[in-house]
Amino acid sequence: MKTFSNKVLTKPEAEQALDTAIALVRRNLPLYTDHCQNHSSVHDIYPQCENNQWTCGFWPGEVWLSYERTGDEAFKNTALTLVDSFLYRIEHKIEVDHHDMGFLYSPSCVAAYKLTGSEKGRKAAILAADQLCTRFQEKGEFFQAWGALGAADNYRYIIDCLLNVPLLYWASETTGDAHYADLAHKHVTTCLANSIRPDGSTYHTFFMDPVTGGPVRGATCQGYKDDSCWARGQAWGVYGTAISYRYTRRPEYLDAFRRVLAYYLERLPEDLVPYWDMTFTSGTEEPRDSSSASIVACGLLEAAKYVGNDEAAEYTKLAAQMLGSVAAHYAVKEGPQGIGLVRHGTYSKKSPYNTCTPEGVDECVSWGDYFYMEALTRLTKDWELYW
């Protein structure tokens, strides 16, 4: 595994960085209690939005992390107000015909249940798990990401779903119904069989045959091109395999973690924050994606719990080096109400070869803020994950 000489963020420095982030979250509470936070900033300031985006769960996660650190009831009250909104959303099926139930309901409602015993949070999260199960395709054994169920042009999954299926592992734990975890395992097995290339890089999306259920081809939506490696997709691969190993202890998941991590590390620039696609490694004006660094740091710190001491020490050091770079060069230290926590994220960059709509390029992105805080929290204590 590749190693680096970058500065390691110490525990006191992580605590200071976390407290700086929490101060910004506190300042933003009035803006995002009765509204949600947009998926990405505009000139570093997040517009308000209704609770109808796939990213709306990350801001409540930041608020819960702030509550964990401070014990301040102001954070708890805002987060519980948001739980009401998430329960309403899933009960009324508002923009939930997609696979992103984990991103929405784990950091908002599972967190609420774990931290406060909120029955509304538990109910909303179980309903969200039920909704995710409706996306499961028996032919191919995967959760269809987008579009009309069964439609040939959308008969595919995306690697991001590795962070959605933990909602199902949790649902099995809390209800005693193994069906949720069984579907999660089937999806992860399909994903790891098809989405990881021989060199450890990953496809963003993967099409399956709606008639036979067999694999068809990998493709990108938000990466540079089909055969490149979208940085955030690779990051989802790192963290998602670590979480699936946490719930299942299946050795093939840990093997996959090591493979995707090794590729990710080989393609990093000097400051350990990747460009938005890993086809770019240095000497380019292409934008970075700071969110990927924080996501991978979370995966490293989760995996460190389940490996030998030497390997765990390597993972912890790597995570602290990545977070040291983000904290020093990308994190916001102060700013007006509405400002994000981490600059230089990339939501969706158009290229001549991809199909995405350009949004949130070189901006703060809501998941980047959340995973930065989660990773810092992991460095400061033995954290019970929301996923």
Regions found by a protein language model. Give the residues of each.
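Glycan-recognition and catalytic cores of secretory/periplasmic carbohydrate-active enzymes
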Residues: 1-387
